[in-house]
Design a protein with these regions (language model features):
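Sec-dependent signal peptide recognition
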Residues: 1-9
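N-terminal signal peptide c-region/cleavage motif recognized by signal peptidases
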Residues: 11-16
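N-terminal, motif-rich segments that launch catalysis or mediate targeting to/interaction with membranes
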Residues: 17-245, 275-407
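Active-site beta-strand/loop microenvironment that shapes enzyme catalytic pockets
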Residues: 246-280
Length: 407
């Protein structure tokens, strides 16, 4: 069916598999006034290996319970190959065994760092470069993160750990996990071929773990079954379970860090372009677009593809640039207040394993048409992003401290 080609192109031309350009900034703003975080004691930094060593039997049991549940509960879930199970006796490479049991990219750095809010950096502290924190495929000219090194046994604020960790899954967790991706693990993990994403860009291999099209019609799924092969809700389930275990067993640093990883996937599905392939276009219009293309009039189809790709990219660029600049001025702003607004929180149901599918993505889909229209109206009058010169080269950003500008 030709509708398949249109939907495949829409997913392939998504400009990025990131839901938001920097999850840390929004997480700070949304969570900083919550008493459970604001009043929580500082936590001690510890390497992953310490948590795994001290809690190995519990981690092994949890991962087996999660695998059994996933096979029964998550649609289109590809079972984990049995040889990836954590060994009964810990090996000499705990980290590798743990990451492969989770079916995460084993090449991620898991650097012990925190991100500060823009304008609140600590220039006297040691910083890491982006390529020391993020795998190569996720590096981008748009990377603006500042990474402050934290040492083992150092005490840090829970909010800093949680907000910083909320950005981490974009540092390579889900890169090259499919059988047709470069590298070795794709042939081992059992996910099969990459269902959607643009193969020209290696970072797009993370898309099926960061996007979820859960509310399409039966006609769309019949024409494009690949849309059902995405697992952001499963990833969040894994990480939330690990967070509960870490908190319960006296490892709050990893509790907050795993919690941030899970929060990342929830935030991804608040992005309408991650929950709806073509916002604002109903099924009849979608079929009309494809019918006209079949008849030789493909201009409207191509325009729709370019429109959604442009709006997706521009809203993420704007969100990142705007937040960075507003925070560096230190001035109040209604949009900043909106991040911390909890007035509607009690109207939402309790969190559950299906929350991403039934609540988060459903709300994003319901709002997607109006959101897309608003972005379109803004782009009609918006100036070219000042992050770019007329030669389409990213301009250097100066930070508040000379020491940072030398990095």
């Amino acid at each position: 069916m030709k509708l398949t080609s249109l939907l495949l192109l829409l997913c392939a031309t998504a400009p990025s598999a990131w839901g938001w350009s920097n999850h840390t900034v929004g997480s700070y703003l949304a969570l900083q006034d919550l008493p459970a975080l604001r009043d929580a004691p500082q936590v001690e930094v510890e390497p992953l290996e310490r948590f795994l060593t001290e809690q190995y039997p519990a981690v092994l049991a949890l991962l087996e319970q999660q695998e059994s549940f996933a096979r029964e509960h998550f649609a289109q879930y590809p079972p984990r190959p049995d040889n990836l199970k954590l060994p009964a006796v810990p090996s000499d490479n705990l980290r590798h065994d743990f990451l492969t049991a989770l079916r995460i990219n084993p090449e991620i750095y898991l650097a012990m760092v925190i991100q500060p809010l823009p304008g609140k950096d600590l220039p006297e502290r040691e910083h890491l470069q982006a390529n020391q924190v993020m795998v190569e495929q996720t590096l981008s000219p748009w990377n603006r993160q500042r990474f402050i090194v934290v040492a083992e046994h150092e005490k840090v604020a829970p909010l800093a750990v949680l907000a910083s960790a909320a950005d981490e899954p974009d540092y390579g967790h889900d890169i090259n996990l499919f059988s047709d991706n470069p590298g070795e693990v794709g042939a081992l993990y059992g996910f099969g071929p990459q269902p959607f994403g643009d193969a020209r860009f290696q970072y797009s291999s993370q898309a099926p773990f960061h996007m979820g099209f859960f509310h399409e019609s039966a006609v769309v799924y019949a024409a494009a079954g690949f849309l059902e092969r995405s697992w952001p809700d499963w990833r969040a389930y894994q990480y939330m379970g690990l967070a509960r275990l870490a908190f319960a067993s006296g490892h709050p640093y990893w509790g907050y860090r795993f919690l941030g990883w899970g929060l990342h996937h929830i935030q991804d599905l608040t992005q309408p372009y991650h929950a709806k392939p073509l916002p604002g276009v109903d099924l009849a219009s979608l079929l009309l677009l494809e019918g006209k293309a079949i008849a030789g009039f493909a201009e409207d189809k191509q325009a729709s593809i370019e429109r959604v790709a442009t709006r997706h990219m521009e809203v993420e660029k704007y969100q990142s640039t705007w937040l960075r600049r507003v925070l560096r001025t230190g001035q109040p702003h209604p949009m900043l207040d909106a991040y911390a607004d909890v007035a509607q929180d009690k109207s939402y149901p309790p969190y559950s394993v299906d929350y991403l599918r039934e609540v988060v993505s459903a709300e994003a889909v319901n709002d997607s048409a109006a959101f897309d229209e608003a972005i379109g109206q803004w782009l009609e009058t918006a100036p070219v992003s000042s992050d770019f010169s007329s030669g389409n080269q990213l301009q250097r950003e100066d930070f508040d401290h000379p020491a940072l500008n030398q990095q």
